[in-house]
Amino acid sequence: MAKLTKRQKAIAEKIEAGKSYNFVDAAALLTELSTVKFSESIDVAVNLGVDPRKSDQVVRSATVLPHGTGKTVRVAVFTQGPAAEAALAAGADRVGMDDLAAEMKAGDLNYDVVIASPDAMRVVGQLGQVLGPRGLMPNPKVGTVTPDVANAVKNAKAGQVRYRTDKNGIIHTSVGKVGFDAVKLKENVEALIADLKRIKPASSKGIYVKRITLSTTMGPGLVIDQGSLEA
């Protein structure tokens, strides 16, 4: 059996196996256990009572977190005319059409979110092999193909997170950073859970939100007592 590192021992001593933590207590403990030299993200994993093998039970959406994620988000927008001006005014980092597509084909992909107006999809459609593997392909299901590109830019800049169930029916997303106020983190997670409940597939039976786990980038996962959340 491999020996535990000093950090792993310290973590093991602080965590109670099998315990469900009050959210605020969990956030405080994760912050205490974060000893790495960079600002770790705080992530949530939500196990949903869905069968992801069934297309009508794949949960995919986006949520604007009330307090953002603490990350700087770079946004590119495919649109033209007045919508282009509106996107720039809303804070887009780059707006274009064929010129932007050419840049991306050449390898300029330093963006976290790519948004497109419906009339721009003729250009974006050529970028499937470039944007798809990076999870950047605009999609109407998560609000990144929309006539209102300015609002989509504002949402992205405000800390909108996008997610979909993995093969095990679990949603993974960042909800903040170590050092965030615990109450703000809690409100971010509550907003996410409320959205997940709102889009619950009609064919999903039994318990829907089965388990919520909070973790840091390099740290342990703590199971959250759902009774400590207002969602």
From Swiss-Prot:
HAMAP family: Ribosomal_uL1_B. One of its GO terms (molecular function) is tRNA binding. Keywords: Repressor, Ribonucleoprotein, Ribosomal protein, RNA-binding, rRNA-binding, Translation regulation, tRNA-binding. Disulfide bonds: none annotated. It comes from the Bacteria. The keyword Lipid biosynthesis does not apply. GO terms for cellular component: cytosolic large ribosomal subunit. Binds directly to 23S rRNA. The L1 stalk is quite mobile in the ribosome, and is involved in E site tRNA release. Protein L1 is also a translational repressor protein, it controls the translation of the L11 operon by binding to its mRNA. This is Large ribosomal subunit protein uL1. NCBIfam families: rplA_bact. Part of the 50S ribosomal subunit. GO terms for biological process: regulation of translation; translation. Pfam families: Ribosomal_L1. The gene is rplA. Belongs to the universal ribosomal protein uL1 family. Coiled coil: none annotated.
